[in-house]
Amino acid sequence: MIIAPSLLAADFGRFAKETVRVEKAGAKWLHLDIMDGHFVPNISFGPQVAKTLRPLTRMFFDVHLMCSKPEILLEPFAKAGANQVNIHVELGDQVTPLIWKARSLGMKVGLAINPPTAIGLLHPYIGQVDSLLIMTVNPGFGGQEFIHETLPKIQQAYAWRAENKLSYRIGVDGGINFATAAECARAGADTYISGTGLFGQRSLKAAIKKMAAIALKNHPAGGFDPDHPIEAAIANVSAQNASKP
C-alpha cells in the first residue's frame, strides 16, 4: 500500500521543511498537485517547486497535472525530478501523445479521471499506463467531501486489472481520510492520496501508519505486489538519492 501525502495541504510557506517532515513520517511518495487556473479553477505551483524540493528527499514524486496544456510541462517536470506524471483522460485525443512523450522523458505515467466522466474512457489506455487515478472529488481545491458514487469506478479498475492480467496501480485522490480509505480499499484501491486527512492529524507519522494499516486490512488482496514496476521505481529512487553526496 502507498500512502501519498499531498503537498497541497502543507504549509505553502514551509514547503522544504514540510517535505522533510513528510519523509521522516514514513511516506515513500509525495503527491504534487499542479493546477493551471483553466482546467481547474485554482492555481497551485510549477516545476520550480519540484526542482527545489528534489535534492531534499528520496521520495517518489507523483505529479498530478490538472492542466489544459500538460504538454508544455512534461519536460520541465522531468528535468525537475518528477518520477510519475498523471494526465487526465478528459483531454481526449491528446492522451496517447502525452503518454508517449512522458515515457520518452523517463517518467512513469498515470491516467486520472474526474467524478462525472464515464469510466469506460479509461479502458483503451489501461495497457499503456502505470497507474489509474480515480478522482473522488471534483479537482481544484483541497478539503472537499468524498464522493461515494466514485467507488464503482475503483471496482471497475480493479476488475479490469485482474481480467487483463495487468499491473497498474489504482489510486484515489480527494476526501481521503481513515473512513474513506477503508471504503476505497474494499473497492480495490492500493494508492491513497491524502491532504487534510493526514496533515490535519496531530501526528503525521501516526496518521500515515494508521491509514496504511486500515487500507491493508480492508483490501481484497491484502495489499499489492511489491514487485510492481512502481514499487521497484520507488526503491530505485531511494537508492539513487541515498548515493548522492
Task: Label every model-predicted segment.
Residues L166-V172, N177-A181, A185-P245:
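Alpha/beta catalytic cores of nucleotide-metabolism and tRNA/nucleoside-modifying enzymes
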